[in-house]
Amino acid sequence: MLENRKRDIRKQAYALREKCKVSRYGIIDLFRECERLGYKLLRYPLGEDADLGFVMKKDNDIVVFTNTCSRLAREIFTLAHEIGHIVLHLEKASSFIDNTITIVGRSMDEKEQEANYFASCLLMPDDEVDKFLDLEIADFADKGLTAMDIARIMSEFNVSFEMALNRLENLDKISGYERIKLDNERNQLRVGNLLRSVGGNQRLNEATGEIEIPYEYIEYVIDNYNHNAIPQETLEKALECYHLTIEDIRDKLVEREEAEDEDLDALLGGITD
């Protein structure tokens, strides 16, 4: 990636970050910020082997999806990656679908690399990283970083251990050798134990399995049911996401014949068509 392009991406990432609510160093809740920015956010547990996320244009909306079977830290990075596609690429494309290859950074596709760089700048801006190392790691210049320090960075910036290492190495805060050493420490001590030892956010290392669907999509669900596209069981599952029952929307339903079974995963798939 050319330096001029990287500079442009940094500017756009930092400009968007200024609209977000931040703690001492990190964005407090990127999911809420996504909604505040006007995007329609869907969070659903598609499975550990499924795609991590996607972004698409649907009518006048921009729909962002994240798979809540991912560890929370990875789901947050996936969301930041999808926001990168929105800011950088969505004017010239209708959708992007991302998996482990594109999110982890092994893809050679230029747009995927740019979205990853945007996400890194959004979540861990270089000036905030410098400030953290200066103010929070007293002996950084002399002794470098430990795995416990990385766990603290995870909690402050709401990122994964791997993402913290990637960003620190890219900013020349650690060498390739130091990265391997920290990786080995991580493997020996385990991220969950490291987070506990520093009083960090242990949820970052766990999948939430949460279901969040924009409320207006209930109309889409009802319409599918009324046109025999989904069975009552699927309708009821969808209503549970909104804490509703059949009786709450009875006046919007039409009499219909029983349709073939189809689950909520298929319904969400229909939203992406």
Which positions does each model-derived feature cover?
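Active-site hotspot residues in diverse enzymes, especially metal/ion-binding acidic/histidine motifs
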Residues: 1-273
